[in-house]
Design a protein with these regions (language model features):
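Class I S-adenosyl-L-methionine-dependent methyltransferase catalytic core
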Residues: 2-220
Length: 220
């Protein structure tokens, strides 16, 4: 069993977290999924119970992998079976491909390769990805469904980010995004389109419902 708790990739992330102040370029692949967006996607394609790429602070699901687990070394399908149902969510890192002791820990091509292998074993894998149809990693028809989101999506700063100066004081970064579904039991169309505004508005409604006292009592 390879120990992934001290890779160069994780060392660099921990270094950034430890800095008292940051530049926007420090964020790299650490932009966070907005809660409202996740809740809307979860309602459409969930329940999503396993966050595949988390830093331990930004996880959207009750079960999650962190960088020290290396999601690319894990059996996602088996984990979902152990959890007892539901699907997995991913806002994957876009770092260049890196290895640790012969095993890939980053790289979208390798993430997609592992995802397709896990799909064959069973389970649903819901990815939030940048629209990059010309990139080598773009899976195309290997994804069972691709929902293109009309309108750019604002992503949140990581929890550890502290701006070094006024020029670094932004709250979001916007990207063209698609939702990819990897699930060999999918019976819907291969392509669809979603509205950013409808998604985010529905997500905000769900967030407000979660804050209502009666909802919290039921959940308890």
């Amino acid at each position: 069993m390879i120990d992934f708790s001290n890779t160069e990739y994780l060392q660099h992330i921990n270094y950034l977290r430890s800095k008292p102040k940051h530049l926007l370029r420090d964020i790299g692949d650490q932009w966070r999924t907005p809660d409202a967006l996740f809740l809307a996607i979860n309602e459409l394609y969930g329940p999503l119970v396993l966050d595949l790429f988390s830093d331990g602070q930004n996880n959207k699901c009750p079960h999650f992998y962190t960088e020290s687990d290396n999601a690319l070394a894990q059996d996602w399908a088996q984990k979902l079976q152990e959890i007892g149902g539901g699907g997995a969510f991913a806002n994957p890192p876009y770092s260049r491909a890196k290895k640790h002791k012969g095993s890939y820990i980053t790289g979208m091509s390798y993430i997609m390769k592992h995802t397709i292998a896990q799909r064959e074993k069973g389970g649903r894998y819901v990815f939030l990805v940048k629209v990059a149809t010309s990139e080598e990693w773009w899976p195309g028809e290997k994804a069972d469904h691709i929902a293109f989101i009309r309108g750019r999506i604002p992503f949140d700063l990581p929890a550890w980010f502290s701006p070094a100066n006024k020029r670094q004081e932004v709250t979001t970064a916007s990207f063209g995004i698609a939702v990819m579904i990897f699930d060999k039991t999918w019976t819907g169309s291969p392509i669809s389109y979603l509205s950013r505004d409808v998604l985010l508005n529905r997500g905000m409604e769900l967030m407000n419902e979660l804050k209502e006292p009666q909802t919290l009592v039921i959940a308890a």
